[in-house]
Curated annotation (Swiss-Prot):
The gene is dxr. It comes from Helicobacter pylori (strain P12). InterPro entries: DXP_reductoisomerase, DXP_reductoisomerase_C, DXP_reductoisomerase_N, DXPR_C, DXPR_C_sf, NAD(P)-bd_dom_sf. It comes from the Bacteria. Its EC number is 1.1.1.267. This is 1-deoxy-D-xylulose 5-phosphate reductoisomerase. GO terms for molecular function: 1-deoxy-D-xylulose-5-phosphate reductoisomerase activity; manganese ion binding; NADPH binding. PANTHER family: 1-DEOXY-D-XYLULOSE 5-PHOSPHATE REDUCTOISOMERASE, 1-DEOXY-D-XYLULOSE 5-PHOSPHATE REDUCTOISOMERASE, CHLOROPLASTIC. Keywords: Isoprene biosynthesis, Manganese, Metal-binding, NADP, Oxidoreductase. Catalyzes the NADPH-dependent rearrangement and reduction of 1-deoxy-D-xylulose-5-phosphate (DXP) to 2-C-methyl-D-erythritol 4-phosphate (MEP). The lineage of its organism: Bacteria, Pseudomonadati, Campylobacterota, Epsilonproteobacteria, Campylobacterales. NADPH binds at T7, G8, S9, I10, G31, K32, N33, N113, E115, G187.
Length: 368
């Protein structure tokens, strides 16, 4: 298999599972963590390696692997790979082209890069995609029951770092506080997305593309991150998917469903410790961006705008140019503006052009 973004949280877990399952690693890619990819090269001995920055070439120790550089290099590497499976764990819209290239080459795509579906779900062959996250894995597992007819799909949110912060203090919070996730240890972008509830807006759009636009789609807060998804059926019964909060479960099924079903990759749940499970609505007062959920489901191509404005705002937030309120305001302004504009987005080039336009328009965000 090919692992793109091998030095991130998902990538590292994917390599653990690959080693456990005896899956050969043909190629690896990383962004800036050259020290870690050097270690991974020693262990997994890939035939190909891609890095983002040519300035890092001197520090790379490829041990005979063919080296590719930049986003174009990742595309070229995928083109040459013979593996049937690509796991795309690149962060941000940078992973979009890699998803397209993988599907063009008729590869199965284990997709952890949310932005691919959020920005271009209408252009991707969903039949070749396995989502790598707990919520969509939970939905997939629940929808294996073909006797019951689903009516609504519900995914869970932890509530993120500011779920108990006094409302009047949320807008002035900084990145350091946003990165204190109560349940998970993840990369900085997804942790901030969890605090803003953008992550759940992404997952709502992913659900739309993956499991059908005809069903009602919603989310709720479940603080323990043990209930990952629920499906309500036409008979008004509801089935929930519960599992330990561990990404190795969805990753293992994305790599090899048969082996995953026979080998436990996570700890068993202690059912007697589950008395704390409680469902709460997502408050629009606390998570103001949640008010755009219905707008996005009515016009899912706005996902490009959501993602581009979010990436611009997060960069400024991490650089201490804006506080959390400025991040929320940037995304709100972008969605309000582009909701009034018609656009078709009938090709990848058009998606990337709109992505660039939104970034350009919102890169000079005033300090808030």
């Amino acid at each position: 298999m090919v692992v793109l973004g091998s030095t991130g949280s998902i990538g590292k877990n994917a390599l653990k599972i690959a080693k456990k399952f005896g899956v050969e690693i043909e190629a690896l890619s990383c962004g800036k963590n050259i020290a870690l990819i050097n270690e991974q090269i020693k262990v997994f001995k890939p035939k190909k390696v891609a890095i983002l920055d040519p300035n890092d070439l001197n520090d790379l120790e490829p041990l005979g692997a063919k080296v590719f550089v930049g986003l174009e290099g990742i595309d070229a590497m995928i083109e040459e790979c013979v593996s049937n499976l690509v796991l795309n764990a690149i962060v941000g819209v940078a992973g979009l082209k890699a998803s397209f290239k993988s599907l063009q080459r008729n590869k199965k795509l284990a997709l952890a890069n949310k932005e691919s579906l959020v920005s271009a779900g209408h252009l991707l062959d969903i039949s070749q995609i396995t989502p790598v996250d707990s919520e969509h894995f939970g939905l997939w597992a629940l929808l294996q029951n073909k006797t019951l007819k689903p009516k609504s799909l519900i995914i869970s949110a932890s509530g993120g770092a500011f779920r108990d912060t006094p409302l009047e203090l949320i807008a002035i919070q900084n990145a350091q506080n946003a990165l204190k996730h109560p349940n998970w240890s993840m990369g900085s972008k997804i942790t901030i997305d969890s605090a803003s509830m953008v992550n759940k807006l992404f997952e709502i759009l992913e659900t739309y593309w993956l499991f059908g636009a005809s069903l009602k789609i919603d989310a709720l807060i479940e603080r323990s991150s043990i209930v990952h998804a629920l499906v309500e059926f036409e008979d008004n019964s509801i089935i929930a998917h519960l599992a330990s909060a561990d990404m190795q479960l969805p990753i293992s099924y994305a790599i090899d469903p048969k082996l995953a079903s026979l080998n436990a990759s996570i700890k068993p749940l202690d059912l007697y410790a589950l008395s704390a499970i409680k469902f709460e609505p997502i408050s629009m007062e606390r998570y103001t961006l949640w008010r755009y959920k219905d707008l996005l489901l009515e016009n899912p191509k706005l996902g490009v705008v959501l993602n581009a404005s979010n990436e611009v705002a997060i960069e400024k937030f991490l650089d201490k140019e804006i506080a959390f309120g400025g991040l929320i305001q940037t995304i709100s302004q972008a969605l309000e503006l582009y909701a009034k504009m018609p656009f078709k987005l009938s090709s990848l080039d058009e998606v990337l052009a709109l992505d660039r336009e939104v970034r350009e328009r919102f890169k000079n965000v005033a300090r808030v």
